[in-house]
From Swiss-Prot:
Species per Swiss-Prot/TrEMBL record: Prunus dulcis (Almond)
E.C. number(s) listed in UniProt: 4.1.2.10
Recorded catalytic activity of this chain's protein: (R)-mandelonitrile = benzaldehyde + hydrogen cyanide
EC top class, as a word: lyase
Binding site for substrate: Y485
Protein name, UniProt field: (R)-mandelonitrile lyase 1
Domain of life: Eukaryota
UniProtKB keywords: Disulfide bond, FAD, Flavoprotein, Glycoprotein, Lyase, Signal
Residues listed as glycosylation sites in the UniProt record: N30, N44, N145, N162, N178, N218, N252, N255, N309, N380, N402, N420, N467
Leader sequence residues: 1-27
Length: 559
């Protein structure tokens, strides 16, 4: 048997073993207050004492950046730079009830939610706070699809992956109560044929299940910032309201290396920080922020950067390309009687679509980006928001600069939703399944009128097409009613911008660790994977340095 074939077989067997380990859910976090113990080593970027030399500088205190910085600080001096502020200044970020409020709050340039409209004309948001997206999202937690790892171009230590998930889950993940509306929607998914019933599980598997949540059963949010508590307070410094303007590079172009960063504080003053020998700059600024910073620093398409008068440090045609966002299509139903508000805890998973629902109280101000545009009609009573997500997707766009010098000016974003016909076909399948869902006995009590089919429901916005065989009507529905799922990824892909250790190709001491690294979602709700990724890469870096130091020691001993 050929060596390559044997390697594939061994890898698949390893995946199966890991899958069995996944199935045994270990103890998760307990209900508790959000743990802000780490604030003792958080500083405002105006503090000039932060300027200096570090072993590692991590740019972006978000989903991957927080666990990465905490892990590296176990052995080395680390500076974590975050453009936003801390959650204590915005207490609504810390509760499940505050999820919609955070999207409603006007963007003043400092609030946790930064608004933007993509060039597709669709409303979107991104995080601007320590903890990143984990502070503003819907709290859904799951592990990656077990097949995802073999598609990434990375050689994973799957035992370490499993232990790293547990490290995250022990701190910030709970088993949620099966809230009344979530229980109803779960019964509906099963009755509509999204089988089997997988009970409670963190695994991404076909079927219906109750999954983990970063909201505990008191409604308190837990998030990536709490993982900073696992860092060494003697080694870890966190600077908030620090906008990194540019990565600094060595003057030796034949041995190009990242040596530090320039960042600006909230007063507009500029600061510098540097990395020591064998240290690294690691960019974890997210799918939008990371390619933007690379481009501003001179890493990207040569002719494009030159046209903006940006000095080209390392040409790479793929920086900012292959940008993805999963389309979200939905229906909104008004039940005849009020339903309690709930966040997403039940998932319906198929290979060609993922389905969830949340229930909401009425509001007079629309949560920005929950609906495709601000002109969408407003609910006057409690309603159910029932969603179908397209996996992948295959359609992709790009990040381009809106300013060649100011990182605080948001870049231009285009996702090209449904430009790939497979994505559109998957949307049609998903929306037809929502039609099946509406026809179930589980949802019968939520009709406003006792008539057959789906006409008995009161809809907010566009109703679902009645004729399940009319693909053209469903395609039109998908195209005309697409919204953002906020699951941005790509822009700095492994194999195109990064090597298989997440190093930027052609540059020493520079890595990227965040959602910009892969061209597809690891699962239906990716925050679990990217929390794991930060810790995982941190451990890999510590292991690399340990091996290097041991080799140097052995050489010295032999002399």
């Amino acid at each position: 048997m050929e060596k390559s074939t044997m390697s594939v077989i061994l890898f698949v067997l390893h995946l199966l073993v890991l899958h069995l380990q996944y199935s045994e859910v270990h103890s998760l976090a307990n209900t508790s207050a959000h743990d802000f113990s780490y604030l003792k080593f958080v500083y405002n970027a105006t503090d000039t004492s932060l300027e200096g030399s570090y072993d590692y500088i991590v740019i972006g205190g978000g989903t991957s950046g927080c666990p990465l910085a905490a892990t590296l600080s176990e052995k080395y001096k680390v500076l974590l730079l975050e453009r936003g502020t801390i959650a204590t200044e915005y207490p609504n970020t810390l509760t499940a009830d505050g999820f919609a409020y955070n999207l409603q709050q006007q963007d003043d340039g400092k609030t946790p939610v930064e608004r933007f409209v993509s060039e597709d004309g669709i409303d979107n948001v991104r995080a601007r706070i320590l903890g990143g997206t984990t502070i503003i999202n819907a709290g859904v937690y799951a592990r990656a699809n077990i097949s995802f790892y073999s598609q990434t171009g990375i050689e994973w230590d799957l035992d370490l992956v499993n232990k790293t998930y547990e490290w995250v889950e022990d701190a910030i993940v709970v088993k949620p109560n099966n809230q009344s509306w979530q229980s109803v929607i779960g019964e509906g998914f099963l009755e509509a044929g999204i089988l089997p019933d997988n009970g409670f599980s963190l695994d991404h598997e076909a079927g219906t299940r109750l999954t983990g949540s970063t909201f505990d059963n008191n409604g308190t949010r837990h998030a990536a910032d709490e993982l900073l508590n696992k860092g060494d307070p003697n080694n870890l410094l966190v600077a908030v309201q620090a906008s990194v303007e540019k990565i600094l590079f060595s003057s030796n172009t034949s041995n190009l290396s990242a040596i530090g960063v320039i960042y600006t504080d909230s007063d507009g003053n500029s600061h510098q920080a540097f990395v020591r020998g064998n240290g690294e700059v690691i960019v974890s600024a997210g799918t939008i922020g990371t390619p933007q910073l690379l481009l501003l620093s001179g890493v990207g398409p040569e002719s494009y950067l030159s046209s903006l008068n940006i000095t080209v440090v390392q040409p790479n045609p793929y920086v900012g390309q292959f940008l993805y966002n999963n389309p979200r299509n939905f229906i909104n139903n008004f039940p005849p009687n009020p339903i309690e508000a709930s966040v997403v805890t039940v998932l319906g998973i198929r290979s060609d679509y993922y389905q969830v629902s949340l229930s909401s109280l009425p509001f007079s101000t629309p949560p920005f980006s929950l609906f495709p545009t601000t002109s969408y009609p407003l609910p006057n009573s409690t309603f159910a928001h029932i969603v179908s997500q397209v996996p992948g997707p295959l359609s992709h766009g790009s990040v381009t600069l809106n300013s060649s010098s100011d990182v605080r000016i948001a870049p231009n974003i285009k996702f090209n939703y449904y430009s790939n016909s497979t994505d559109l076909a998957n949307c049609v399948s998903g929306m037809k399944k929502l039609g099946d869902l509406l026809r179930t006995k589980a949802l019968e009590p939520y009709k406003a009128r006792d008539v057959l089919g789906i006409d008995g429901f009161n809809y907010l916005g566009v109703p679902l097409p009645e004729n399940q065989t009319d693909d053209a009507s469903f395609e039109t529905f998908c195209l005309d009613n697409v919204a953002s799922y906020w699951h941005y990824h790509g822009g700095s892909l492994v194999g195109k911008v990064l090597d298989d250790s997440f190093r930027v190709m052609g540059i020493k001491a520079l890595r990227v660790v965040d959602a910009s690294t892969f061209p597809y979602e690891p699962n239906s709700h990716p925050q679990g994977f990217y929390l794991m990724l930060g810790r995982y890469v941190g451990l890999q870096i510590l292991q690399e340095r340990s091996i290097r130091l041991e080799a140097i020691h052995n050489i010295q001993e032999s002399m």
